[in-house]
Amino acid sequence: MRDLLLGRPAKDFDIVTDARSEEVTQLFPGANLVGAHFGVVLVRSDSHTIEVATFRSEGAYSDGRHPDQVVFETDPAKDVLRRDFSINALLLDPETDEVIDLVGGRADLNRGIIRAIGEPRRRFEEDHLRLMRAVRFAARLGFDIEPTTFKAIRELAPQIHLVSPERIREEITRILTEGGASRGFELLDATGLLHELLPEIERMKGVQQPPQFHPEGDVWIHTLLMLEQLPSNPTPELALGVLLHDTGKPPTFRVADRIRFDGHAEAGVKIAREILTRLRFPNDTIDQVLHLVANHMRFMNAPKMNASTLKRFLRMERFDEHLELHRLDCLGSNGRLSTWEFVKGKLEELPAEQLRPTRLLTGEDLIAVGYKPGPQMKTMLTAVEDAQLEGVIHTAEEALALVNSRFRP
């Protein structure tokens, strides 16, 4: 209902009813009973899966996530009162098209307010992930968090550690990718959740940068500006790359002829790995994010690269994400896109066969003409590929002649 009233496309539809789960499964024989204790049934309709839940009230939450007791109800008001925020507690009567608002959710939608239902501390202590959900909804919708709700989040922020890393990971990913990422991280900071979850990001605050390259200010501001420029529906890897690419700056900060962060990309890889591992991101996500962090400074040298180095650079896996990270890096600092335009132009100019040409020689070819297997063979093949990428050689005969001239005793 929330998204429909805001004029946004609704991603899914949930149904609440006084019917018990066994009645629902009788009506829909193919339905899947996924939460008998909670009266939740999944019903397939065409290509959609709809969650059908029985009205219920709940007892205390001893574990901070699951209610100790569930009572099935016939009164929708009791069901609504257990929900997290007023804007998520609006119901639509399908027979009359009447919006049923029992907690002031429609007024909060109109005012742009995220407000916990009832006593905020109790709502958050029922499920501590709601601390982050409040931030996500405020960021994505461009809403403010109601003062009493905000105060409760700040007071309970240390309890976010009671939530599993996997659930925190999913919420961070959604904050980064569903819109309003910059606002989301400002709110994580303001509520104290950033301090609890990502102290490495918090350390960016106040770390100044050379003004000739970063007139925007410190590393924190730079990162927020990049998050603000993220395209719609970015991949999690790109969004995480933006968030983490400069985590190596605080520990490498020094003042010499100017402010410098020598080796910050390498330091950032180590820090990013610690964060992503702590939050239990999958290995393929970790690998790509670390690749983005490790290579983000290479763009500054792209116009000076020789042909072989540039072509190898351009053929990095998922290079589009590297290129987009660089564009955002520029937009979040001095705004100069000349290097991005150069690299993008080269990418469009060079056909795939020039970036990844067919190999002229293999190790077997070299063994066949008398070379012995060993570490030097890799050096030989790299030299051949360099010359091929540079356009110096074009045939197997030329490649073998090059090897003989350089490596034959």
Feature roles, as predicted:
Residues 1-409:
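Catalytic cores of the polymerase beta-like nucleotidyltransferase superfamily
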